[in-house]
Amino acid sequence: MLPRFADIFQQGNRWLNWLEKQPEGAVRPVVIESVTKIMACGTTLMGYTQWCCSSPDCCHTKKVCFRCKSRSCPHCGVKAGAQWIQYLLSLVPDCPWQHIVFTLPCQYWSLVFHNRWLLAEISRIAADVILEICHQADVEPGIFTVIHTWGRDQQWHPHIHLSTTAGGVTSGHTWKNLHFYARKVMSMWRYRITRLLSRKYPDLVMPDALAAEGSSKREWNRFLDTHYRRGWNVNVSRVMDNATHVAVYFGSYLKKPPVPVSRLEHYAGQDEIGLRYNSHRTKREEYLLMSGDEFMERFSWHVADKGFRMVRYYGFLSPAKRRLLEEVVYIITETVRKTAMQITWRGMYQRLLKVDP
């Protein structure tokens, strides 16, 4: 039996029909590879193990098919998210944390779409803002960022989720608490992004929507200055008391694939696909109805480039400073190290369905 999510691509040859309509080279190879894996996920095409009854009088066998492990697969994403939570629980120190969401003006979204390398740059800038505030206070924080390209309605909406310790370790190896405020963080973020886009002007591929604004360096800087004068949305959470809340709550939210199966409906044998989502604007659950072609297009936007790291670590959580984390931070925060539990498909099956696959 095919996985439920694969039905979207296979029923009525939705995926192949959409792919044939696209101009040559318009669909990134990684998108084709991801969808191919998703369609084969959980089938014998991915390989399988076969279990046989040990009794010589019984011919009963059972095949357990392998999963695709694609980052865009919602089925495999459940396991990947659960494993990442375990990794976070074993890594982050037990101290206060804050979560910050860095967004861009909507006029910049298409620019990032046509210059996907900017995603890594804006992740680094978000971390640099927090690092600069902390270094001014003689503090080394622990930071991790998660790059998201989708909004709740699956539109293209690049933004950065950043979790940081609400403080950090000083040069004297003591702990110092800090609180981050939206106004200061926003102004630093806005300045650095504007400076980046001005400096990288020669390297940018201008989308059609910004053809006039990007016609010359002078026009481009004028466009950037217009948006620099406006307020940008940077959301800073309240301080959370411990690392467990950070790992479990944000781990389950941030690591999930773009399209959760639980929010999809109304697509069995029909061309229309329904998506339930909680609207930021109305604060209510809304329902979006998409054609098969529209769903394929939106899905293709959010497939990460091969080898691109969606999660990044900075400060004493960065690999280069793990020694500081292990020899100083765990001690002064009195963190009891946890061992990451290994998540397996068999264990998840047994916990959720009470059946040994």
Regions found by a protein language model. Give the residues of each.
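Beta->alpha loop/short-helix hinge microenvironment recognizer with preference
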Residues: 1-357
